[in-house]
Amino acid sequence: MQSFTREQVQETLEGKGYKYFTGGKYDVNIVGIRNSSTGDEITNKFDDTMTVSYKDEDGQWNYHEYKCTTDPGKYWAENIMNKDGVAIVKPGQYRGSHQVGLHQGKYKALCQRKPLKVYRDDNRDDHYDLDESSVQEGIFGINIHKAGKFVNGSTQIDKWSAGCQVFSKESDFNEFMELIHKAKDVWGNSFTYTLVDSSDIC
C-alpha cells in the first residue's frame, strides 16, 4: 500500500476540478487511490489505498489511510459473471453515489445507489483492459465493504471483489464505518466516492 498526505489528496482533487469537502465536522472525503505502479497487471493483492479526510468536532483535520483493492480479483476476472466482462471502476468523482446499506444483506457497508462508470474486461487474461470503448455507466452493485474477519487482513483478493472497493482488514473497515455513521448523523445518508490513480497524486 502506498502512503500519501491529506494535503496531496486535496490538491489532486481540486486540480481535477473535483469537490473536496471542507464543511463542518465529519464532512468526509472518501477517496480511493489505485496503485499505478502495477500498470494493468492483475496482481490479486490489496495494493491500493482508501483514504478518508474530514474535520472533527474541534475543526481539526483528520486523515486516515487503509489497505484496500479498487480492482476485481483474479477469480472474477477469469470467471466472468457479466457477459460484457468484469467491472473495473473508472477513475472519477461520483457525487452522492453511495449510502449506508446492507452488503449482500449481511452487514452494514457503503452500497452503490447512483450510477458509476466501469470498464468491462472480458478476455480472461492476466491484465485489466481499460478500453474506453468498453465503458458502461449504471448501478452495478459496486459497494465499499470488507474482505472478511481476518485479524491481519486478507492478502489475496480472489473472490472478495468482482468490482467492489474492498478493505483488507475488518478492523480498518469497522473504523471506517464508525466515521461514516458519524457523518451520516450530521449530513444524511449520501456519500460521494472519488477514485484517482496514484500517478495523479500531486
Per-range role (PLM):
Residues 161:
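Residues immediately within or flanking Cys/His clusters that coordinate Zn2+
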Residues 1-158, 172-181, 187-191, 198-200:
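Cell wall/extracellular polymer interaction/catalysis modules
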